[in-house]
């Protein structure tokens, strides 16, 4: 495995010998096996914690949301380690190993009854709670899985993007296709996880159901290592996050400096140590330009490099900061999208657990975790139709290969419709259960199909568009940062959900009846919470239309 410097000549030479689609197949395989394993847990985690650990109510939702958030916020640490020390290859490999150990712990919790509390006969009235040490074992497995996700998520798509030369039109076209097929391939893995593995967990054995994803992670690691001879591996050249803090600090220290015509800016050395020149961005956030102003010749050493890196930063470091700030207005819109998908991953599954799950003439029992499959199938069908049918037809008609713009994809109102539908479906489910006097509503689980399908379309339009926007607008050396920022939006969404749920629970509990506090959804008012989420989606659409859309349509690159 060769390590590539980022100078243009060596970059072009190595790209001729390595990278491209022959490297991508190993990277996508690694991602697919990893996603198959992780979604085998994520898709059924609510069911496992509720049925095997007797968790429920706000505590159950808090555990899942905080874990979701931790998985995603640790992508910042993963991106930092990748950029500053290990590089993307080793960060991906070590992250996969951490996930493997974490999943192994989950397999042990399923195999050893002593690691779990005693089972409950009546799920609506259960007092058998897990001991603190049992929760400690459970949380250690979740923690290792979060660490693994922090290493894999920011680097996988960035490592894949490294395999293409985006300075050419052909390379850019390959990269755009890679985005969609990357999403499609792991969606196929999710379909397998949410059908076969979730079915085994629910109806056959939790032990086998966790051994399978553990084995998948072993395959993910093996496949990734086998392909190492085909990879273009960019050298770790320092953390962009650390540079951003340095720029802010240096600019604040020089806040009284007034730019003039006789000002000298510190360009900094090139990647091979030789002098270089860069064009300074003069139009945005000019305050931070002060960080690269040489106010005293003593700030430079004999080689012309900065002596004090917290007082003098290069023009490139300032540009990196401006790249990040330029994408923030559009990035914020992704948070609302992930708030929506979090509801389906948690409350959607809890709804399914309290509905009639029989299907067909033979009364087949549909696992509640299968409902996430609807979202993934919808997403996969849309991407396949879009890439293989819609675009070729449009090209035949117009003679040009037209695609939906980023602005149009984000403006799709699927999220608003999804939560309104979910709210009315929950009202119907709850009313039927109360009328019937039962924990499980006689309403069929099939009634949840529309809201899960709409959630899949929301992700297909908004999440894929956001991922593409962040990756394309960042320079090559900041692609791991783009991946981390993408998952940071999901992390913030999970923490917002946690805060929102606890605030709603506290406020409504004071009024005498909590909307979300009971383990039995029939005693809650979940539909009101869904309508609040719909309101957040409306506010997000207005924010994008009135403010952020201008940043989505800018043609200027971040490099």
UniProtKB/Swiss-Prot annotation:
The keyword Membrane applies. Keywords: Membrane, Transmembrane, Transmembrane helix, Transport. Expressed in flowers. Signal peptide: none annotated. The keyword Zinc-finger does not apply. The chain crosses the membrane at residues 57-77, 92-112, 132-152, 178-198, 206-226, 321-341, 374-394, 404-424, 437-457, 481-501, 529-549. It holds the Pfam family PTR2. One of its GO terms (cellular component) is plasma membrane. It is found in: Membrane. InterPro entries: MFS_trans_sf (IPR036259), POT_fam (IPR000109). GO terms for biological process: pollen exine formation; pollen tube growth. GO terms for molecular function: transmembrane transporter activity. It is a multi-pass membrane protein. Belongs to the major facilitator superfamily. Proton-dependent oligopeptide transporter (POT/PTR) (TC 2.A.17) family. PANTHER family: OLIGOPEPTIDE TRANSPORTER-RELATED (PTHR11654). This is Protein NRT1/ PTR FAMILY 2.8. It comes from Arabidopsis thaliana (Mouse-ear cress).
């Amino acid at each position: 495995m060769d390590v590539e410097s980022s100078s243009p000549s060596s970059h072009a030479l190595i790209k001729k010998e390595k990278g491209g689609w022959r490297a991508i197949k190993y990277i996508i395989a690694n991602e697919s096996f990893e996603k198959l394993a992780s979604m085998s847990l994520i898709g059924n985690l609510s069911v496992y914690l509720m049925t095997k650990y007797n968790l429920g109510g706000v505590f159950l939702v808090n555990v899942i949301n905080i874990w979701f958030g931790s998985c995603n916020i640790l992508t910042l640490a993963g991106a930092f380690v990748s950029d500053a020390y290990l590089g993307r290859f080793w960060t991906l490999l070590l992250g996969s190993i951490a996930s493997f150990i974490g999943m192994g712990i989950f397999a042990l919790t399923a195999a050893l009854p002593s690691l779990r509390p005693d089972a409950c006969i009546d799920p609506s009235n259960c007092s058998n709670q897990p001991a603190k040490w049992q929760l400690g074992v459970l949380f250690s497995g979740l923690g290792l899985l979060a660490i693994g996700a922090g290493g894999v998520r920011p680097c996988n798509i960035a490592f894949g993007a490294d395999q293409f030369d985006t300075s050419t039109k052909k390379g850019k076209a390959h990269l755009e296709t890679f985005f969609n097929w990357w999403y499609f391939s792991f969606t196929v893995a999710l379909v397998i996880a949410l059908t076969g593995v979730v079915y085994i967990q629910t109806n056959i054995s939790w032990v086998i159901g966790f051994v399978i994803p553990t084995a998948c992670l072993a395959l993910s690691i093996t496949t990734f290592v086998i392909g190492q001879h085909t990879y273009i591996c960019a050298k770790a050249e320092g953390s962009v996050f650390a540079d951003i803090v340095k720029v802010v600090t240096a600019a604040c220290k020089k806040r009284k400096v007034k730019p003039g015509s006789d000002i000298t800016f510190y360009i900094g050395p090139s990647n091979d140590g030789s002098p270089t020149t860069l064009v300074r961005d003069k139009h945005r956030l000019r305050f931070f330009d002060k960080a690269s102003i040489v106010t005293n010749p003593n700030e430079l050493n004999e080689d012309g490099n900065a002596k004090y890196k917290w007082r003098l930063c290069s023009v490139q470091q300032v540009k990196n900061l401006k790249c990040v700030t330029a994408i923030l207005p559009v990035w914020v819109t992704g948070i609302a999208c992930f708030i929506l998908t979090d509801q389906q991953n948690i409350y959607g599954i809890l709804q399914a657990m309290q509905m009639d799950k029989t299907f067909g003439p033979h009364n087949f029992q549909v696992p509640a975790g299968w409902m996430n499959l609807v979202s993934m199938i919808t997403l996969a069908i849309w991407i396949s139709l879009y890439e293989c049918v819609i675009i070729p037809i449009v090209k035949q008609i117009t003679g040009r290969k037209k695609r939906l713009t980023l602005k149009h994809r984000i403006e799709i109102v699927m999220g608003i419709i999804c939560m309104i539908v979910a709210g009315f479906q929950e009202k119907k489910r709850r009313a039927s259960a109360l009328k019937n006097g039962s924990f499980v509503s006689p309403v069929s689980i099939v009634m949840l199909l529309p809201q899960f399908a709409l959630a899949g379309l929301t992700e297909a339009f908004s999440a894929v568009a956001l991922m593409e926007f962040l990756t394309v607008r960042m320079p090559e050396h900041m692609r791991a940062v783009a991946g981390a920022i993408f998952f940071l939006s999901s992390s913030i969404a999970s923490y917002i959900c946690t805060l929102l749920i606890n605030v709603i629970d506290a406020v409504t509990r004071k009024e005498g009846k909590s909307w979300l506090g009971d383990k039995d959804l029939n005693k809650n008012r979940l539909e009101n919470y869904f309508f609040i989420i719909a309101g957040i989606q409306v506010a997000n659409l207005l924010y994008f239309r009135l403010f952020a859309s201008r940043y989505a349509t800018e043609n200027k690159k971040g490099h």
